[in-house]
């Protein structure tokens, strides 16, 4: 009933938005897109009319044309990989209009972020960000979201073999990093355990965006470490005339990898529909030491969406289904595999360029039904289910008293249950609600943003345990400074954020044998919330020959929650009375004596570090690039290292780029990680070599990209410090990958 009412509200909200140009006479808008450095036509560029949400690609000669454009004032943008995104104002009358556009080559800050209240270029973001799309996404594409992103500054990969993987941002993992799909939470259980993966095929993504550092203001308390947004556009929000889409096919030699993904939008200018699907399969992969048994995986997805698109508003819905299966290597009891299934239903409405004080709005409703079973051979050991409903409304107002901003509300209902041998928790209902405010004030050479968010979360567990409530405030203030003499080619970005996170469900209630984390885990229902105070400082520069960013950060967190190992005697002294907790009998430290007891504790901690990325243009075609990141985490009272911190890392690369051709390589240099906690095993440093070539061309208004990559070209034997199986398994050996993408 709640879902039906919310869906109806979204529909009414959308159709209530007026369309000012609906009855006006229509004409054409056409022009030529050229490259600023040489005046050559720009083929395959995406030209977008913001207010009408219309888009088209340029032909081989750089020309574009829109039909049926009502009279009015519009902002027209050009998006092309490797070029600065430009927006130009144009006035369209009753006769055909012409607008020629010029794009400038951009080495690094070429994309626009959608994760902020109002989309803004990377160069002008308050926090460090990363964006992968187009040719760059093809160059980085792997079988998981985490593996695809792991070469970006500040991002590492938590793994449990090859399939279960999740991004780690600045050393923060699990419930501190939010993964969303088209702005909505994925509804899976990858944050809870290392053997649970993110149920998204990265080949099906149109783009990926990452925010490094607290993103709690807009995305909730769980984004205290950062945010990953996977954009697939299952609900069309732009007017679509005819058809547009993307197809990706990839194959790899290691593990006999293969897969494909595609999505198509078709429409008549008023109604638009989305059809999408993907599939991938990987056999047992090989390391320099040989093949890894039971390391296979497969993924299949399907999605269907539709929307009504007006002149200034839209409303639509989509349905998606994900079916996965992957093996867990190195389990002595026999072959263990997981079979995640996820149903997702979304309703979304939005409007922009509206008359009145509210100039735009966005309303979303997402329903997720997730379940996976842990299979021991053909027998079901444990079944986990997670049902989730999430809703959000954001209203953005026109400038008033110098302020431009947004106000919004958010709610979440989650029902978690585990049944079987590893039923670590009683069934738990989680209800969260929040309200937030975000404002900006701008001057010629500076912009200030500030905002606040109030979150309330209630956990209601079964099993006779008491309900637990948390109410916390998060706030942030940030500044962008553009020195006048720099002509907008140098920016100083600074932000100070107070973020609060209530304990996660697993930190409060887990109790029992958990093979996914190689532990016997002991939750603590009395844990207090984490409260962090984080500071970010970023320096960004761009010019004809160099573009780059250096960022420094520090995060002081009170009551930092982590898994602390304890002895058998400590367990007996502190937890012996809970032997029948949740109707699950304990079995000591595991019958084989191989599982360590871990209890969730909270202690004050500090994390600090630095990130840098730069591109240097030696000549018109030869470009060097470098990436560096480091993070340190310590407990304040003892100065001990925090567990599972990524090692220092540097990447050096060189590429040749001429029009649509890129050929290059890079060396990934990772330091020894011996700053460990307790009995955590250290890892040696290593260097891996990566070679690639990519070519993009336009034919018949279709953009083709072919990418070849040789990963770990020297077949280096190395271990990922954040892989829970690192003591038993090195990482994947030499792999050749071929990726073909088609956009139209």
Sequence positions of predicted segments:
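Short acidic/polar hinge/loop motifs at secondary-structure boundaries
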Residues: 185-214
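Outer-membrane beta-barrel translocator/receptor signature
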Residues: 204-207, 212, 217-288, 295-301, ...
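Flexible loop and strand-edge segments within Gram-negative outer membrane beta-barrel domains
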Residues: 282-283, 288-289, 293-299, 313-388, ...
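Conserved C-terminal beta-signal and adjacent last beta-strands/turns
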Residues: 300, 307-310, 352, 490-494, ...
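Outer membrane beta-barrel strand-and-loop segments of large Gram-negative receptors
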Residues: 305, 382-395, 434-436, 528, ...
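Surface-exposed extracellular loop regions of Gram-negative outer-membrane beta-barrel proteins
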Residues: 323, 332, 369, 415, ...
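Gram-negative outer-membrane beta-barrel transporters
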Residues: 403-405, 445-449, 554-556, 581-673, ...
């Amino acid at each position: 009933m709640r879902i039906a009412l919310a869906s109806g509200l979204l529909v009414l909200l959308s159709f209530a938005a007026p369309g000012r140009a609906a009855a006006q006479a229509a004409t054409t808008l056409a022009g030529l897109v050229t490259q600023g450095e040489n005046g050559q036509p720009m083929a395959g560029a995406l030209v977008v009319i913001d207010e009408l949400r219309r888009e088209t690609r340029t032909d081989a000669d750089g020309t574009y044309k829109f039909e049926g454009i009502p009279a009015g004032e519009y902002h027209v943008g050009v998006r092309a990989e490797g070029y600065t995104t430009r927006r130009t104002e144009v006035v369209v009358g009753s006769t055909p209009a012409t607008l020629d556009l010029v794009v400038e080559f951009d080495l690094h800050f070429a994309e626009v972020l959608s994760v902020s209240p109002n989309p803004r270029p990377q160069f002008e973001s308050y926090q460090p960000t990363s964006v992968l799309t187009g040719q760059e996404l093809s160059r980085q594409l792997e079988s998981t979201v985490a593996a695809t992103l792991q070469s970006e500054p500040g991002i590492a990969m938590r793994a449990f073999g090859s399939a279960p993987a999740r991004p780690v941002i600045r050393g923060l993992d699990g419930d501190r990093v939010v993964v969303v799909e088209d702005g909505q939470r994925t509804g899976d259980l990858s944050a809870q355990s290392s053997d649970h993966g993110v149920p998204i095929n990265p080949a099906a993504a149109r783009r990926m965006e990452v925010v490094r550092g607290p993103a709690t203001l807009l995305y909730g308390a769980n984004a205290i470490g950062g945010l990953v947004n996977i954009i697939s556009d299952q609900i069309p929000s732009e007017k679509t005339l005819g058809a547009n889409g993307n197809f990706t096919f990839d194959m790899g030699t290691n593990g006999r990898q293969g897969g494909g993904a595609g999505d198509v939008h078709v429409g008549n200018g008023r109604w638009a529909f989305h059809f999408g699907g993907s599939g991938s399969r990987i056999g047992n992969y090989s390391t320099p030491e040989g093949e890894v048994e039971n390391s296979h995986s497969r993924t299949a997805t399907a999605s269907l969406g539709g929307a009504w698109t007006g002149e200034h508003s839209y409303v639509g819905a989509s349905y998606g289904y994900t079916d996965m299966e992957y093996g867990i290597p190195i389990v002595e009891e026999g072959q263990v595999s997981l079979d995640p299934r996820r149903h997702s239903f979304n309703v979304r409405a939005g409007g922009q360029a509206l008359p009145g004080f509210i100039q735009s709005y966005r309303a979303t409703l997402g329903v997720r039904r997730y379940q996976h079973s842990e299979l021991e051979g053909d027998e079901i050991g444990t079944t986990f289910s997670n049902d989730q409903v999430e809703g959000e409304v954001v209203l953005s107002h026109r400038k008033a008293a110098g302020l431009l901003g947004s106000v919004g509300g958010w709610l979440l209902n989650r029902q978690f249950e585990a049944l079987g041998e590893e039923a670590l928790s009683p069934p738990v209902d989680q209800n969260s609600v929040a309200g937030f405010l975000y404002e900006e004030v701008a001057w010629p050479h500076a912009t200030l943003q500030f905002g606040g968010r109030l979150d309330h979360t209630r956990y209601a567990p079964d099993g006779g345990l008491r309900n637990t409530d948390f109410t916390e405030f998060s706030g942030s203030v940030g500044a962008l400074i553009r020195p006048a003499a720099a002509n907008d080619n140098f920016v100083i970005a600074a932000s100070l954020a107070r973020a609060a996170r209530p304990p996660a469900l697993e930190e409060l209630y887990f109790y029992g044998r958990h093979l996914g984390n190689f532990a016997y885990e002991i939750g603590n229902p009395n844990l207090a919330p984490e409260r962090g105070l984080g500071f970010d400082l970023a320096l960004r520069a761009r010019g004809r020959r160099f573009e780059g960013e250096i960022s420094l950060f520090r995060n002081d967190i009170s009551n930092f929650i982590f898994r602390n190992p304890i002895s058998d005697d400590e367990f007996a002294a502190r937890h012996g009375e809970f032997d029948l907790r949740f109707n699950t009998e304990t079995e000591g430290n595991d019958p084989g004596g191989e599982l360590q007891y871990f209890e969730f504790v909270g202690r004050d901690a500090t994390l600090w570090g630095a990130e840098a990325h730069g591109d240097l243009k030696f000549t018109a075609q030869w470009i060097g690039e470098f990436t560096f990141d480091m993070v340190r985490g310590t407990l304040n009272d003892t100065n001990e290292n925090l567990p599972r911190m990524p090692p220092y890392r540097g990447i050096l690369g060189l590429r040749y780029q001429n029009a649509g051709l890129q050929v290059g390589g890079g060396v990934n240099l990772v330091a020894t990680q011996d700053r460990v906690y307790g009995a955590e095993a250290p890892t040696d440093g290593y260097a891996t070599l990566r070679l690639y070539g990519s070519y993009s061309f336009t034919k018949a208004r279709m953009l083709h990209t072919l990418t070849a990559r040789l990963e770990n070209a020297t077949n280096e034997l190395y271990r990922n410090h954040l892989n829970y199986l690192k003591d038993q398994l090195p990482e994947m050996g030499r792999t050749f990958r071929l990726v073909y993408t088609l956009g139209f």
